[in-house]
Amino acid sequence: MKKVLIAMGLIFSISLFSSDNSSADWQIKTYSSAAPSFIGDFATVIGGKGETLREGSNGWTCQHGNPRPFPETGWKSAHEAMPVCHDDEGMKWMMALGEGTKPNLSRDSFMWMLHGDVGEDNLVPGVLDKKDTTPGQWIESGPHLMLMPKDPKTLENFTADFSKGEPYVMFPGTDYAHLMIPVEGYYQYQK
């Protein structure tokens, strides 16, 4: 019995080391699965420290979308990493949001986030702590597709109400307004 327990302990220890969420393998698998496989399997993958982990062949890029600093041991889960897959126009949008500048897109772009995100204010960009959120506007989303418009004004006739299950605008009235398109499982993290 003692040998069985020791063996089980060794197996458990080995499995802990093999699930290193900062590894290139984990990041490639996790980030590329933010989009359907026909996109993610052929996309370039950027690691948590900005390095290219895999060159792609389809013009799409997958990376973590969580704006918080990349943890030394990696993200705890795919959901926490908030992986996103986008094309070059989507990258322009991501960079502009991160730099606080106005996106300058040559056309509309789509982004996939099939692992969702860990929550933010639906009205105010950059508010990532629930206690600082506009009352009633905290949304922790499940799987979704996003439309990043070249001209955010084209979204003015869409609702900003995320509780209905229909496409809605996140960050309405700002340069970062985009259309959130919920897919199956979108509300799994709402409490």
Predicted features along the sequence, with ranges:
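Positively charged n-region of N-terminal signal peptides that target proteins for export
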Residues: M1-V4
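Hydrophobic h-region of N-terminal signal peptides that target proteins for export
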Residues: I6-S18
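Primary mode marks residue(s) on the alpha4-beta5-alpha5 output face of response regulator receiver
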Residues: D20-K191
